[in-house]
Amino acid sequence: MRTLWIVALLLVGVEGSLLELGKMILQETGKNAITSYGSYGCNCGWGHRGQPKDATDRCCFVHKCCYKKLTDCNHKTDRYSYSWKNKAIICEEKNPCLKEMCECDKAVAICLRENLDTYNKKYKAYFKFKCKKPETC
């Protein structure tokens, strides 16, 4: 089952420490990262590009910008450690870059939770060709 989860995340193109990011999103929102955010709006999941469609999509846009600031680690392949204590994500990494990557993922998971009321099903499987030119970070 764990292998299927990792393969599914790879197929939708979610970046970062895939397993950790997916778990954070589930813990914070109660939603499955793949089915709920894998192709949401213009910026969530694979093919992310374009003006955010709503606050939920903006969370993903800001997340991509956060990743662009990482310098000494690879957000597509490197993994980090975190824990879930008292309903809070705790980034436990000693490596500064991996800690920052964890903080990027933590921030998007919290942002998605804080914007659950903006989640719009019409953007769930949004066609990326409809997206307008992206703004810069």
UniProtKB/Swiss-Prot annotation:
For this protein, the activity regulation entry reads: Heparin and wedelolactone inhibit the myotoxic activity. The PLA2 inhibitor, para-bromophenacyl bromide (BPB), inhibits the myotoxic activity.
Q: Which GO terms describe its molecular function?
A: calcium ion binding; calcium-dependent phospholipase A2 activity; heparin binding; phospholipid binding; toxin activity
Q: Which PROSITE patterns match?
A: PA2_ASP (PS00119), PA2_HIS (PS00118)
**Which keywords does the record carry?**
Disulfide bond, Heparin-binding, Myotoxin, Secreted, Signal, Toxin
For this entry, list what GO says about its biological process: arachidonate secretion; lipid catabolic process; negative regulation of T cell proliferation; phospholipid metabolic process
Localization, UniProt? Secreted
- What InterPro entries does this protein map onto? PLipase_A2, PLipase_A2_Asp_AS, PLipase_A2_dom, PLipase_A2_dom_sf, PLipase_A2_His_AS
Which N-terminal stretch is annotated as signal sequence?
A: 1-16
Intrachain disulfide bonds = C42-C131, C44-C60, C59-C111, C65-C137, C66-C104, C73-C97, C91-C102
According to the UniProt record, one GO cellular component term is:
extracellular region
Task performed by this protein = Snake venom phospholipase A2 homolog that lacks enzymatic activity. Has myotoxic activities. A model of myotoxic mechanism has been proposed: an apo Lys49-PLA2 is activated by the entrance of a hydrophobic molecule (e.g. fatty acid) at the hydrophobic channel of the protein leading to a reorientation of a monomer.
Q: Cite the record's note on assembly.
A: Binds to heparin.
Family as reported in the entry's similarity comment: Belongs to the phospholipase A2 family. Group II subfamily. K49 sub-subfamily.
Under what name is this protein listed? Basic phospholipase A2 homolog MT1
Instruction: Name the source organism.
Output: Agkistrodon contortrix laticinctus (Broad-banded copperhead)
